[in-house]
């Protein structure tokens, strides 16, 4: 982070939901360890009531523009107004649940000195399948030369941002970090009788955005190639045969990062389960399999 700008910019389009926005902002303040390191850019419409922002330990700026903009245009407006070294896309219907989320997120970008990577948190609905709230570096966005295609009305923006990194993983270059224990609860769900809380898209808007996503596959391939030209030029030719973005979403394509306490708790739970199934013999067999 330079002395003249924040490390992280959070871009939050918001309209007509002041109570949700206030709840979100307060949850940020309650959980951040170093709030002076980030800023929040609220992207609002000129025909909406100006947001009332409570006293907060971080900077909040309001970017106002004409009504009727697509979500792609709203995000681009927020990005144009941002100053951070890293950019995170968010919604106003979110509650941040994890203390120290800011330090955990920023720490991940030390993994690769070039910062050409994607980090995402646990939205509690789509989880590791899709980067609902993606975090990208300014270096990466400068390299690919764009942010959000303005054509996307509401959906497929996260798919679009994730897809080049799924392509990289498909050719053996993992640059996506998934943080399952950093929880940004997305409070936009319906209750499914079998699956529980699930995110539900507007089918009419999705029917327009999905073909746009398909049509922009060559754009995303070009972005993946730009990254490979920088970090693994010998793999560039492997991108061209890719034709199905959703087929790339395989287990293991991401680097999963968990705190030590969570890993220990998981190990204890596995040990208890093995003991219940097979007593000490089952526990011993499970341990030897882990060591083999």
Regions found by a protein language model. Give the residues of each.
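C-terminal catalytic/acceptor-binding lobe
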Residues: 23, 159-292
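Glycine-rich, basic loop-to-helix element that forms the pyrophosphate-binding segment
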Residues: 65-82
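Aromatic-glycine-rich donor-binding/catalytic loop that engages nucleotide-sugar donors
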Residues: 138-155, 164-173
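Short aromatic/hydrophobic "clamp" motif used to bind/position activated sugar donors
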Residues: 87
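N-proximal low-complexity "stem/linker" segments adjacent to membrane-targeting elements
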Residues: 1-29
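Acidic donor-binding segment of Leloir-type glycosyltransferases
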Residues: 25-66
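Cell-envelope/extracellular polymer assembly enzymes that use nucleotide-activated donors
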Residues: 6-9, 39, 160
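Conserved donor NDP-sugar-binding/catalytic core segment of glycosyltransferases
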Residues: 94-133, 139, 174
């Amino acid at each position: 982070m330079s002395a003249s700008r924040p490390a992280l910019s959070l871009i939050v389009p918001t309209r007509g939901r002041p109570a949700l926005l206030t709840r979100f902002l307060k949850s940020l303040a309650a959980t951040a360890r170093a709030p002076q390191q980030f800023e929040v850019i609220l992207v609002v419409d000129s025909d909406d009531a100006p947001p009332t922002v409570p006293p907060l330990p971080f900077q909040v700026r309001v970017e106002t523009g004409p009504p009727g903009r697509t979500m792609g245009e709203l995000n681009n407006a927020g990005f144009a107004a941002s100053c951070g070294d890293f950019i995170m896309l968010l919604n106003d219907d979110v509650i941040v649940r994890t203390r120290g989320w800011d330090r955990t997120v920023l720490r991940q970008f030390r993994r690769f000195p070039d910062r050409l990577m994607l980090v995402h948190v646990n939205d509690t609905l789509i989880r590791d399948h899709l980067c609902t709230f993606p975090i990208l570096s300014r270096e990466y966005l400068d390299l690919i030369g764009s942010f959000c295609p303005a054509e996307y009305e509401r959906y497929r923006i996260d798919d679009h941002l994730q897809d080049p990194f799924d392509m990289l993983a498909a050719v053996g270059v993992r640059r996506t970090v998934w943080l399952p224990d950093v929880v940004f609860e997305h409070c936009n769900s319906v209750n499914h009788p079998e699956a529980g809380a699930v995110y539900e898209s507007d089918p009419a808007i999705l029917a327009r955005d999905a073909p746009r996503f398909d049509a922009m596959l060559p754009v995303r391939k070009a972005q993946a190639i730009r990254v490979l030209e920088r970090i693994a030029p010998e793999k560039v030719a492997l991108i061209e045969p890719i034709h199905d973005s959703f087929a790339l979403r395989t287990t293991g394509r991401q680097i999963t990062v968990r705190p030590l306490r969570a890993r220990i708790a998981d190990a204890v739970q596995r040990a208890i389960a093995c003991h219940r199934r097979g007593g000490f013999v089952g526990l011993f067999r499970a341990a030897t399999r882990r060591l083999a």
